[in-house]
Amino acid sequence: MSTTLRRAWSSLNGNDGVLPYFLATLNEVSLLQARPPPGHAAAALALRRRRRDTPPSRRRVPKENVDPGSSPAGHSPFRSPTSSAKPLGNRNRGLLPPRPPSSNPLKRKLDVSPAAAADSSGGAAAAAAAAGGGCPAPDSGVQVVVRIRPPCRVEEEEDARAPDLCVRKTATNSVAIQGQDFTFDAVADEVSTQEDIFKLVGLPLVENCLSGFNSSIFAYGQTGSGKTYTMWGPLSALSEDSTCSERGLTPRVFEQLFSRIKEEQGKHEDKELTYHCVCSFLEIYNEQITDLLDPSPKSLQIREDVRTACVYVESLTKELVFTTKDVTQLLVKGLSNRRTGATSANADSSRSHCVFTCVIKSESKNLEDGSNSTRTSRINLVDLAGSERQKLTHAFGDRLKEAGNINRSLSQLGNLINILAEISQSGKQRHVPYRDSKLTFLLQESLGGNAKLAMICAVSPSQSCKSETLSTLRFAQRAKSIKNNAVVNEQKEEDVNMLREQIRQLKDELHRMKSGGSDGSNGSFSTGWNARRSLHLLKMSLSRPTTFQTIHEDSGDVEMEIDENDVEKPYNQDNMVISPPGDKECKELQASLKINGGTSLDVFDGENLMPTKRSCSDDRYKLNLAASIQRGLQVIENHQNNGAWRRASVGFNARIVDVQPCKVDVAIQTEPEESEARDNPLALISSHVLGTSATVSNDPNACRDLQLVQYDAGITRDEPKQQQILKAVEKVLAGAIRREMARDEQCVKQAAEIQQLNRLVQQYKHERECNAVIAQTREGKIARLESLMDGTLPTEEFINEEYLSLMNEHKILQQKYENHPELLRAEIELKRLQEELELCRNYIDEKEVLQEEIQDLKSHLHFMLSSSASIRRLWPPVQLSHGVGPSPVTNDADGDNNAVDTPDWAEAESKWVTLTEELRVELEANKSLVGRLRSELESEKKCSEEVKEALQTAMQGHARILEQYAELEERHIGLLAMHRKIREGVEDVKARAAKAGVKGAELRFINSLAAEMAVLRAENKGLQDQLGDTAEAVQAAGELLVRLKEAEEAEALAQRRALLAEQETEKAYQEIDNLKKNYDQEIVALNQRLSESSHHQETTLAIEACDMETTKYDTAGSPGDQQWREEFNQQGGSFEVSKSTDLNSWFSGYDKCNI
């Protein structure tokens, strides 16, 4: 073996000595030690054969592309067997190869066993077969998929002399280039489709997103390798039908996402599951961030939230999406605004990195426990600009500047990935330069943070792009070593501790009753105190199980006999239930709320005390309120007059603690007489008690001290005692199971406490961050003062910076002050009190105004009614002409008729009188209605005053009851002290009895102790009954308060109805005024027309008399005059007739229109 080791060391110092040879030598040594070697010559021959079969590599790996961990050689078991990497040079090689770090995951591949040595040649093929067969590998945090772009026509023409592709797919998850094999999660060759890429990367991303994980997809590669096509597809495919085969990864992801959202919502309809998706689209061009959804020339800035340590882009447009069509529209808009340019390598080259982000928030509610769950996940789809070389792209000007920024950004990304890979492999912490570029700073969660990362590395198979393809594959290999820490982003809002919450609410209610009870007469009682809420809190507190505090004892098991009858009674009373009363009590008091049962208290050996349970019956609302109040008052008076009540130094604890049932030491004494067993108060527990405690107990300490004791075989003939022994054994076994279950419950409670402590830690962390910001401003101020003292900073600039710093500090302190919970609570309380005061003032002012308006309307109505009769007597009766009746006719000498219409004023006046009478009747009805409503309002006011007085009295009684209830809780300490003393005395008696044995004198002493304990038990039961009666009285008072509150609401409703009636009366008054005004105007118009009509008749009669005299003295007339008369007659009659006709017709029509 020494010869073999010497040759191994010489091989390490030779030209071909590398780590695999040393490992193979160690393998040979292990084989030689496992079985007797045939000789040193055989071992040396095997070593020389292994060295001869392994050809050396001719190619060195560039130092910047070496894996961040230790770089094994080409034929190491760490690499694929077909690798042909060149060994390390002499200057990098020492006596021993560098030891890989202990946390290097590649060490798992090393196996120096004989089986591993035999199968070392097919290791890579087996790994590839396992990956291809669908066997899930351990999740490394980063999924790397390589996609080989099919060669284009130009590349086929250029590579006509060398038709072989530079990279080829050798397995489902490995590729080969220049004799080197690279293994990844999956490899998509030239014939792969967009659907294949979506199945490899998109489907897991959607499922991770719905599970609450942050997920990211990076597309990396050289320019023209198909990154943009893979991520988005052509723009024509986005605007076409969704069945287009060229659609990219992003639209397919969101189509699947919305489909799964609908499926989840249909599956969890009972949880009220809702989803909200918010998308944004940005690009990084020449280290400047712009918004693709809002193409403005301004540059956006990256901000970091100091409270949550989240990085975000300020003023970035965010769109809420609901369907795949909405996402497609955003993609089309953003990609059309993205900066692209033409180069010699790519006609449509992307000149910027673009990031499409979608934040998905899901909210669900569990109806069983009332908890709310919120999951938030983020999807980052990143299309990186391709790296390029100037000698291939022939870029100049702006294109050259863009290429420099792109290469610089990708170089910083590669440096970051190298550091992260080194940290993941070595476990040593290093500074991670996230802030070197805006790309890495923006996506730091995806790189080594809380996200699941998938990287699509696009490569070109052309021989001209061989070096870029090799660099991309090495980059992907380094990225595969990164370890992310993805967690589910879920927040659950669980219910708070009901015990503390109810105690706090009851104390607040008591304080509110004491402070605001005397303000109930101001009309705003309902705004300051809610009786229904107080009753609900009281019922919840009474319905919760109540137990005493746990009293631990250090004494061990003592063999004693326990009286079965004395112990069974309190165990049978294991529930305190507020149940409907029986038939007898319903006949006497239908409203009494019966509280049955009591607490199960083991005063002998009970480390824990039996819980009491209350369950409120729904039938208590149907009982009579008055009888219930009377019953409660009687109970309180009886308690005050009872001497035992005053002498009792114990109280009932209504505080809710953990349910910890009792345990009883079950043992057997050697006395077989049944009479002594019946007389002994420390007899065996009945089987019913054992079964009950076995099924109810959940205490981890329950039955801790139970054991089986030896007993005399002579008394086993008693069959009942044998059954008791068997059931005691059953209880011991059940106690073991209960202890295990109780341990689980204790773990749950401790987890809840840990969660509460975590919340406190988060709160303290937030305060520390605020203090850190303030400290940072102080340090900046000190630095500015130093610069000012040194003279490097001008005074004006110092003043400006100091002012800005102080403004920022003031803003931080203002936010801290405004967000203080005490300040917010005080502001809310002040606003509530101001609103109540304003309501009271408005109510008083409106009441006074309404009363004044009612008085004015009453006086105005009285005046109108009294004046209408006098006005009607003063006006003469008028007649209106309808122009349709017969009229007197006068004939002139030419046969013309003059018709004069006589207006019928009496008929019109009768109509007006009828209308006035109707209005008077309606007015009287309104007056009676107002009087009735006024009387109702007065009665409601009286009722309201009575209700307020009763409510005040009930409030005072309720406050006294609550004080008594609180006093009972405080007096529970006295009960615990008394119980401890009793238990110590019993323990002393047990110890003495165990030492001396149970004999006549000792038995009588024990009997006397049992009598005292029975008295104490009876007193305890009386206290429980008193507490039940108190609870009954409290509930009755609560019911009274609720009824009084409802009466107050009815009073408010009656007041609103009275207000509506007054408004209707006011409207009636307004209608009467309008009718009177119209009536006055019509009367004046009719008088004027009557005077004009009489004057017109007189004028007409005078004209007709003149015409008759002229006709009498005229002769036959001249021919001209005769001709004029004929022409006038042909035109339609004489002048007088036409005039008279026109006047009559106009007056008649006018009268018709107006009447």
Swiss-Prot record:
Biased amino acid composition, Low complexity: 87-96
Record region (Microtubules-binding): 349-353, 382-388, 431-435
Chain coiled-coil ranges: 823-861, 934-971, 1006-1089
Positions that bind ATP: 221-228
One GO cellular component term: kinesin complex
Main location: cytoplasm
Listed InterPro entries: KIF15/KIN-12 (IPR044986), Kinesin_motor_CS (IPR019821), Kinesin_motor_dom (IPR001752), Kinesin_motor_dom_sf (IPR036961), P-loop_NTPase (IPR027417)
GO terms of biological process kind: microtubule-based movement
PROSITE patterns, A to Z: KINESIN_MOTOR_1, KINESIN_MOTOR_2
Compartments in which it is found: Cytoplasm, Cytoskeleton, Phragmoplast
GO molecular function, one term: ATP binding
SUPFAM superfamilies: P-loop containing nucleoside triphosphate hydrolases
Sorted UniProt keywords: ATP-binding, Coiled coil, Cytoplasm, Cytoskeleton, Microtubule, Motor protein, Nucleotide-binding
Region span, Disordered: 47-117
Top-rank taxon: Eukaryota
Extent of Basic residues compositional bias: 47-61
Domain Kinesin motor: 141-482
Function: Plus-end directed kinesin-like motor enzyme that plays a critical role in the organization of phragmoplast microtubules during cytokinesis.
Family classification: Belongs to the TRAFAC class myosin-kinesin ATPase superfamily. Kinesin family. KIN-12 subfamily.
Record's protein name: Kinesin-like protein KIN-12A
Organism: Oryza sativa subsp. japonica (Rice)
Encoding gene (name): KIN12A
